[in-house]
Swiss-Prot record:
Reactions catalysed: a quinone + NADH + 5 H(+)(in) = a quinol + NAD(+) + 4 H(+)(out)
Keywords: 4Fe-4S, Cell inner membrane, Cell membrane, Iron, Iron-sulfur, Membrane, Metal-binding, NAD, Plasmid, Quinone, Repeat, Translocase, Ubiquinone
Name used for this protein in its record: NADH-quinone oxidoreductase subunit I 2
InterPro entries cross-referenced by the UniProt entry: 4Fe4S_Fe-S-bd, 4Fe4S_Fe_S_CS, NADH_quinone_OxRdtase_chainI
Organism expressing this protein natively: Rhizobium meliloti (strain 1021)
Cofactor list: [4Fe-4S] cluster
Quaternary structure and interacting proteins, as annotated: NDH-1 is composed of 14 different subunits. Subunits NuoA, H, J, K, L, M, N constitute the membrane sector of the complex.
Family, similarity comment: Belongs to the complex I 23 kDa subunit family.
Gene for this chain: nuoI2
SUPFAM superfamilies: 4Fe-4S ferredoxins (SSF54862)
Length: 188
């Protein structure tokens, strides 16, 4: 019985060794190939697709008024409780938000607020750079949400990065097709 167990143990040991050798060969192959790291933000910048869920922004109607009717559905459906809406009635008798704040530090960017809005007033844009030294800077008010840019119709490409002194400017991609992230990876 011990001889049978000894043979089975040797066979299992060789199988694990073969697996280990396969893994090491793959690792060494990648170690000497070109890196896939994108040179962000120094040399190139990724433009997200139009379906990307980035920053929040509020929309205006044709007359330039805010579309939000302060129904607070976005605040109620938000799983993170990061939206605060305080309604008021304007001089025309329309319900509008006196205060509309989104805490992007707590937000999951799930898009439920966008789906729940009956007036199509809130949407998620393509901006993905939110870095800040203070968490207070990540709370975005109504006026800032109205000033944010909307969605670009193109995206999914990589463009040369350039120093842009204008804030919140969307760069249009020259190529409408997607970007092949795995172009430098060896294929078997």
């Amino acid at each position: 019985m011990s001889r049978a167990l000894d043979k089975a143990g040797r066979w299992i040991g060789w199988a694990f060794f073969a697996d280990l050798a396969n893994g090491l060969a793959l690792t060494f192959g990648y170690m000497f190939s070109r890196p896939v790291t994108m040179q962000y933000p120094d040399k190139e910048k990724w433009l997200p697709y139009s379906r990307y869920r980035g920053h929040h922004f509020l929309k205006r109607d044709d007359e330039g008024e805010i579309k939000c009717v302060a129904c607070e559905l976005c605040a109620r459906i938000c799983p993170c409780d990061c939206i605060e809406v305080v309604p008021y009635e304007d001089e025309k008798g329309n319900r509008r938000p006196a205060k509309f704040e989104i805490d992007t530090a707590r937000c999951l960017f799930c898009g439920l607020c966008e789906d729940a809005c009956p007036a199509d007033a809130i949407a998620l844009g393509q901006q993905y750079e939110f870095s800040s030294f203070s968490s207070r800077d990540l709370v975005i008010g109504r006026d800032d949400l109205l000033a944010k840019p909307g969605k670009a119709m193109t995206g999914g490409g990589v463009v040369a990065a350039r120093l842009n002194t204008e804030r919140d400017v969307l760069v249009e991609a020259s190529e409408p097709r997607g970007y092949n992230w795995w172009r430098n990876i060896r294929r078997k």
